[in-house]
Amino acid sequence: MQTRRSLAVAISALGLLASMQGADAQSGKVTVVTSFAKDVTDPVKRAFEKAVPGAVLEVQNRNTNAGVKFLEETRAGNQVDLFWASAPDAFEVLKGKKLLQQYSPKATGIPEKVGAYPINDRDGFYFGFAASGYGIMWNERYARANRLPEPREWQDLAKPAFHDHVSIAAPSRSGTTHLTIEAILQGEGWDKGWRTIKEMAGNFRQVTERSFGVPEAVNSGQVGVGIVIDFFAFSAQASGFPVKFVYPSVSTIVPANVAIVANAPNRAGAEAFIEFLLSPAGQEVLLEPSIRRLPVNPAVYAKAPADYPNPFTDPRLGKLMPFD
């Protein structure tokens, strides 16, 4: 009997020790490579570190293509736990090169699709945390001063009235711009799509190196119109800038994603970050004025401002084209 009691105590102690070790493993440095600007990463970092005591999120900011290349070049001595970006095709590239590892998030309340697009990778290598749409942002004061009409479609930006008034990020450096170009080509067809893109290009005043260089130029009035991902415009509006935004009929809604990097040095910390980002608390952080992203948990929209876009209920967004 005494032996059985001793064995039970030992098993109980081992279980407690394992749970403590699991909690400790979530703490420490969690390193993420991301294309997102500090306006997005700083609020998430603060909320995550508060939710997971002892965790320290180290943010390495690189544009999407540079981030992919960095993970390729450092795979032998990888020191990164997570990759966090908007463009789904970047995650497919990393997955194809076996630079991501599988995981099964425990978070609930997230549907399988946003519009026609799956939120998570079907093989479990990356996970949508926010929905993203692509469109046209413009500065109302600039537009009035320069007598610009309100753009509604991509073809509008090819009209003579917009000459020298449009900004875009280089698609070779920006994953979101690359996806926008892909959406136009898929939606309009190869020949018509390229004609639209080339005609718009004739009106470009600047081509920035980073995606967030475009909204910065529009917000300041340096240029009048920008081709952007939606949350750049929504966060600018929340900050009081005189800007408007429209989804052209040829556009799409796709998830922005997060993934655990293969051979992540802090796998438990990476898992904790994903669970936080997909939890109600993490999803609510996306509603903050400096972020203004579209959560993938439909229930979170109950806490959003009245005019907040909702891809799960807004018929305008539901009609946007599927993307492959």
Question: Predicted segments — roles?
Answer:
Residues 26-92, 215:
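Early extracytoplasmic/lumenal segment of secretory-pathway proteins
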Residues 61-69, 89, 155, 201-216, ...:
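Short helix-initiation/N-cap motifs at beta->coil->alpha
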Residues 78-83, 101-140, 155, 164-168:
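A structural signal for short loop-to-beta-strand junctions that line the ligand-binding cleft
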Residues 94-102, 121-123, 235-247:
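Ligand-binding "clamshell"
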Residues 137-142, 254-269, 286:
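A bilobed periplasmic-binding-protein/Venus flytrap-type ligand-binding module shared by bacterial periplasmic
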Residues 165-169, 276-297:
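Periplasmic-binding protein-like
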Residues 183-247:
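Ligand-binding pocket segment of bilobal, Venus flytrap-like solute-binding proteins
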Residues 289-295, 299, 305-324:
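C-terminal capping/gating helix-and-loop segments adjacent to ligand/active sites or protein-protein/ligand interfaces
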